[in-house]
């Protein structure tokens, strides 16, 4: 799915529940999660949320092409007009990446000279204001490793001798990563105070319930990460029941 395309998946002709999942690649890795929720009749996925919150307004020094469309109203109008009984908007972005100094606000879009945190908050709220007052779910973070999972597998199962430095990064202490999670959760909670229809979903503890997080956990035979920071299909499907319970309570 490229920036200007929308993936649509319908499991039935019912018009009870619809989910619109949007953001960057950290929204895309929740596609199997949403797909696994049985009582959702239709879901939509595109990257408009990323474009409207980040892509149009921030630039990273290594980024060459910005493929964001500046007119995303067609899909938004279509979603607003769709006649589902309940609609949910789920937004997931790798905010900890965009908060890094490599990412700069394009000056012509920041006439009020806001700092990056306040600027991104404003863009979240501006994006959500284009929709009617549906239930909104903002997703925090998943555990992030410093090493690609493929490297972990080679180190532990295919190499003659285990490299302990790599091993410690493949099985990392949760407390070393939680600061990032707490920062993003706090940031999203500030956004949620602006509207009563915004909820925060934090999958971190579900994915890493113990003191050590694993790219791949051989004891449970569970791949959590596809690479360093994206969920495996297995881990994404694993979250379906948890996200369903979360949605059912809203």
Show where each model-derived region lies.
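Extracellular/periplasmic envelope-modification machinery, especially enzymes
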Residues: 1-250
